[in-house]
């Protein structure tokens, strides 16, 4: 059944329910960046497989919004469909709210599954529709009604993260959160984001691909806590441990009844940016304190134990990636290698490292023109052979018990054109300048983003994605609230970079139809002294994989930039020390790449 037939069935349901529009987002019940298969209704209906996008279906047309990362991919996957591509943020492209205001009649009805739509997005739509007396029908999962073979809701076993890995016990975290609640006057704290629940309880799961979280909600009061979860995913031992520290268990789907049962006027803190619309509607009688969860900043600022573990994880990851680069450059052109088989080979190298848990996201292994598609993921349909020329852009990562990694290396596979060498070098200039930044405490990513982009801007080049994102500790590979981007997303507050945060440093350049360049390291924000101007911070590089000097146009690098490139060498020495006593062959592979 193609997308046109699926939309026809959906429109039949819309007509039966008296709906003038139906909105399908790319979210689960928790506002997660990546979602389990059960929640991929937008993908099922449209055929667009990117991780970000919103589908709006009208009685006689349909449109899909996505961001700059996916413009090329969406154009390709929607070609020949009846769905119009809306390139969000581009000139002349209306917002979803403005589009609905133009198309939905006075007194009309807009439908959506309120469990998957964030309260913030619903408010944005309502503001755009103000004055039209439009009704929201938010209790109808029409997409599910026309999806006969929908996957079941995930219910994978939960496991416990050792306290020595986290640096704080769950009891200590609950105590700290209750202190924050007293400061804000919250009587109840509702945690709806999966990574926040997992972080608070030092638990991990496998309900979302590549993200070690489990489907759950957590209600926290001063004297008690309730975890709404599918109880079959908890072992008897874990249940006993949770109860022992004051955490009661309740069915996952009971969250809305429990919220409605909170006495009127009770001060309840939740975050409309992540809490779904049904959560907020269930709190209609409470005094809602709408603000970011205190967990967000607490988990972003890694404990000393987490910081030390992150370093250990990157040594392991560095060994695996160096071995992969050595293998790839030695074998390309001599044996059949495709994007998919290369990604599998890198995964096999990571799997040989102790305490490896799995990939932190689906690998981007992109040869030649595919590298220009920012978030390209090879599939059986798109897979191509690697040839001894141009670049292979490898954006990959892994979860280890000691931490999460995210690295991009643009690997030369053979002779390069002058344009490829120039682009590789200019992007590296931006990466080095940002990584070397020393800056006052209190600055945010917006202030620093220009350091990475300026070398490209000077050449009339740019990239249509953020420069950096936070990284969780055996959680989401993308986490906030910190980010590096000159453009602030709508309704998002600025968060200053702080000691202990982990951020990516990943400028890029993409020549459509030709090649893509991205250089990505993870950086740990560290204190850099204090003087009469206040405290200063700097970045400590965590990633320990060298950049390929054979791809550089050295004449474009200043002496300072060459020195910065050489300054990364001590990290490679740590890789060598980590393996020289156990595996001489691996040591040779690392030295060859370095």
Describe each region flagged by the PLM.
Residues 1-558, 563-567:
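Active-site neighborhoods and metal-handling regions in enzymes and metal-associated proteins
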Residues 557-594:
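Conserved non-cysteine loop/helix-boundary elements of the Radical SAM core domain that shape
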């Amino acid at each position: 059944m193609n997308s046109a037939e699926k939309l026809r069935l959906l429109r039949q349901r819309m007509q039966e329910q008296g709906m003038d529009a139906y909105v399908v987002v790319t979210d689960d019940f928790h506002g997660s960046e990546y979602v389990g298969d059960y929640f991929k209704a937008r993908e099922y209906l449209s055929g667009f497989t990117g991780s970000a996008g919103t589908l709006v279906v009208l009685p006689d047309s349909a449109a899909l919004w996505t961001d700059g990362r996916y413009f090329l991919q969406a154009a390709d996957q929607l070609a020949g469909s009846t769905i119009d591509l809306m390139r969000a943020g581009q000139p002349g492209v209306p917002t979803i709210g403005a589009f609905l205001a133009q198309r939905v009649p006075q007194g009309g009805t807009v439908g959506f599954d309120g469990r998957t739509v964030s309260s913030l997005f619903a408010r944005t739509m309502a503001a755009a529709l103000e004055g039209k007396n439009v009704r929201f029908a938010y209790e109808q999962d029409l997409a599910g009604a026309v999806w006969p073979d929908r996957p079941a809701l995930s219910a994978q076993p939960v496991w416990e993260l050792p306290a020595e890995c986290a640096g704080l016990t769950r009891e200590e975290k609950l105590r700290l959160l209750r202190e924050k609640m007293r400061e804000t006057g919250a009587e109840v704290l509702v945690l709806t984001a999966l990574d926040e629940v997992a972080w608070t309880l030092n638990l991990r799961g496998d309900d979302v691909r590549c993200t070690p979280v489990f489907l759950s909600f957590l209600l926290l009061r001063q004297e008690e806590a309730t975890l709404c979860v599918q109880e079959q995913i908890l072992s008897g031992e874990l249940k006993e441990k949770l109860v022992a520290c004051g955490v009661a268990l309740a069915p996952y789907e009971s969250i809305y009844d429990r919220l409605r049962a909170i006495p009127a006027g009770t001060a309840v803190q939740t975050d409309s940016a992540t809490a779904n619309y049904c959560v907020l509607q269930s709190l209609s009688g409470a005094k809602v304190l709408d603000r970011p969860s205190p967990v967000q900043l607490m988990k972003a600022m890694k404990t000393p134990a987490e910081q030390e573990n992150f370093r250990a994880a990157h040594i392991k990851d560095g060994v695996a990636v160096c071995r992969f680069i050595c293998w790839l450059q030695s074998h390309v052109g001599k044996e059949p290698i495709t994007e998919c088989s290369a990604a599998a080979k890198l995964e096999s190298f990571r799997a040989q490292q102790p305490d490896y848990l799995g990939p932190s996201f689906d690998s981007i292994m992109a040869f030649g023109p595919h590298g220009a598609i920012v978030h390209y993921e090879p599939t059986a349909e798109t897979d191509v052979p690697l040839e001894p020329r141009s670049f292979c852009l490898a954006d990959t990562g892994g979860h280890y018990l000691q931490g999460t990694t995210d690295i991009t290396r643009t690997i030369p596979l053979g002779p390069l054109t002058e344009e490829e060498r120039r682009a590789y070098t200019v992007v590296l200039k931006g990466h080095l300048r940002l990584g070397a930044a020393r800056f006052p405490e209190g600055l945010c990513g917006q202030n620093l983003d220009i350091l990475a982009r300026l070398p490209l801007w000077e050449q009339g080049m740019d990239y249509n994605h953020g420069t950096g994102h936070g990284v969780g500790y055996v959680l989401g590979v993308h986490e906030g609230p910190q980010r590096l981007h000159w453009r602030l997303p709508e309704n998002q507050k600025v968060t200053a970079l702080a000691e202990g945060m982990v951020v990516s440093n990943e400028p890029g350049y993409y020549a459509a139809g030709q090649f893509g360049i991205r250089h990505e390291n993870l950086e740990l924000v560290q204190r850099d002294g204090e003087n009469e101007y206040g405290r200063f911070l700097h970045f400590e590089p965590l990633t320990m994989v060298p950049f390929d000097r054979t791809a550089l146009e050295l004449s474009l690098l200043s002496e300072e930039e060459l020195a910065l490139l050489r300054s990364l060498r001590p990290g490679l020495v740590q890789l060598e020390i980590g393996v020289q006593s156990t595996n001489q062959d691996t040591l040779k592979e690392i030295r060859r790449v370095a």
